[in-house]
Amino acid sequence: MALNLRKNHPLLKIINDSLIDLPTPSNISIWWNFGSLLGICLVTQIITGLLLAAHYTADTSLAFNSVAHMCRNVQFGWLIRNLHANGASLFFICIYLHIGRGFYYGSYLNKETWNIGVILLLTLMATAFVGYVLPWGQMSFWGATVITNLFSAIPYIGQTLVEWAWGGFSVDNPTLTRFFALHFLLPFVIAGLTLVHLTFLHETGSNNPLGIPSDCDKIPFHPYYSIKDILGFALMLISLATLALFSPNLLGDPENFTPANPLATPPHIKPEWYFLFAYAILRSIPNKLGGVLALAASVLILFLIPLLHTSKQRSMTFRPLSQILFWILVTDLLILTWVGSQPVEHPFIIIGQLASFSYFMIILVLFPIVGALENKLLNL
């Protein structure tokens, strides 16, 4: 009998075991779609980014004009740029929903998968940050100046570190060229880490909404979830196209249409919307080093989440108190995002400080207490 090529060919076998014959829980919901959507985001960003890099010039005197040239004179350059800029926003929407899903359903108990996922988030944030500097507009320049300057808060080595990162005594040409190099490299690092993420995931198999072992009831990934994923792809690509074609500048900062000028500071320096929650936490502490530590902690806290799990149930599906706390945390993050976009004045300062305190309080203190309380209430 002829061998089935799909199951025996060294390369096809890997694809088959990951995307076709992969045993998958029969009850996973639409929330499990976001992993593959992130894969599509990454592919889209790499393709559009490669096309943009072919026309971009990483030089302070030419960068802004090369982007303008791309939008005016390159065939569909405006579309490629808009897809790339808004694709980043969709990437972050998907990754935040993906992390939220993992948090809600206890997927973080697959510790290796979760930790690689957090490293992926950090790499994505670094990629987005260096990418935002490349058009060399006002917000690009001042964003780069403000954020890189934070490293100077590190005791003893801070100033040396910043000047080493800048390649000089301020954000200038060397900074732009190295940021372009990093922005080109990091997406491929993300692709590599994604494979590691999937390798660890396929060691344990997917979690499911009930948070219970599902080995007794698995179904093949294809055709059941491949068709379900295609629906997700279509919805996401339609929303990306809609955003890029109808309101491409909705999420951008108008300040970035002005070429970078080191002599004129914009009235309100703020990052893109997907960093605003962390920016609000940074600003809520009136001390530079303290703010930097809080900023780092706001994301690195994700590494602690598997250690803070006190409940005897994996998922929050049957834990109403934890559910309430989870949605309070989501609301808190939305408040932080809003505060981060506002000027530093009353009442935003105090709102930001309360929201920042609540963020750490909920994750570090309230979730473990409520988890233990629910065990007691349910006599577990």
Curated annotation (Swiss-Prot):
Which SUPFAM superfamilies does the record match to this protein? a domain/subunit of cytochrome bc1 complex (Ubiquinol-cytochrome c reductase) (SSF81648), Transmembrane di-heme cytochromes (SSF81342)
Name of the protein described by the UniProt record: Cytochrome b
- What GO MF terms are annotated? metal ion binding; ubiquinol-cytochrome-c reductase activity
Upper lineage is: Eukaryota, Metazoa, Chordata, Craniata, Vertebrata
Tell me where in or outside the cell this protein is found: Mitochondrion inner membrane
Q: How is the cofactor bound?
A: Binds 2 heme b groups non-covalently.
Task: List, alphabetically, the InterPro entries matched.
Answer: Cyt_b/b6_C (IPR005798), Cyt_b/b6_C_sf (IPR036150), Cyt_b/b6_N (IPR005797), Cytb/b6-like_sf (IPR027387), Cytochrome_b (IPR030689), Cytochrome_b_C_euk/bac (IPR048260), Cytochrome_b_N_euk/bac (IPR048259), Di-haem_cyt_TM (IPR016174)
Function, as annotated: Component of the ubiquinol-cytochrome c reductase complex (complex III or cytochrome b-c1 complex) that is part of the mitochondrial respiratory chain. The b-c1 complex mediates electron transfer from ubiquinol to cytochrome c. Contributes to the generation of a proton gradient across the mitochondrial membrane that is then used for ATP synthesis.
Species of origin reads: Paradisaea rubra (Red bird of paradise)
Superkingdom assignment: Eukaryota
Q: Which UniProt keywords apply?
A: Electron transport, Heme, Iron, Membrane, Metal-binding, Mitochondrion, Mitochondrion inner membrane, Respiratory chain, Transmembrane, Transmembrane helix, Transport, Ubiquinone
Annotated residues that bind a ubiquinone are located at 202
Question: Topology relative to the membrane, per the entry?
Answer: Multi-pass membrane protein
Instruction: Summarize where heme b b562 binds, as residue positions.
Output: 84, 183
Residues crossing the lipid bilayer are: 34-54, 78-99, 114-134, 179-199, 227-247, 289-309, 321-341, 348-368
Q: One Pfam family for this entry, by name? A: Cytochrom_B_C
Beyond the main fields, what else does the record say? Heme 1 (or BL or b562) is low-potential and absorbs at about 562 nm, and heme 2 (or BH or b566) is high-potential and absorbs at about 566 nm.
Give me the gene this protein comes from: MT-CYB
> Which cofactors?
heme b
Q: Spell out the GO cellular component terms annotated for this protein, sorted alphabetically and separated by semicolons.
A: mitochondrial inner membrane; respiratory chain complex III
Quote the subunit structure annotation.
The cytochrome bc1 complex contains 11 subunits: 3 respiratory subunits (MT-CYB, CYC1 and UQCRFS1), 2 core proteins (UQCRC1 and UQCRC2) and 6 low-molecular weight proteins (UQCRH/QCR6, UQCRB/QCR7, UQCRQ/QCR8, UQCR10/QCR9, UQCR11/QCR10 and a cleavage product of UQCRFS1). This cytochrome bc1 complex then forms a dimer.
In which family does this protein belong, per the annotation?
A: Belongs to the cytochrome b family.
What positions does the entry give for heme b b566 binding? Answer: 98, 197
GO biological process entries = mitochondrial electron transport, ubiquinol to cytochrome c
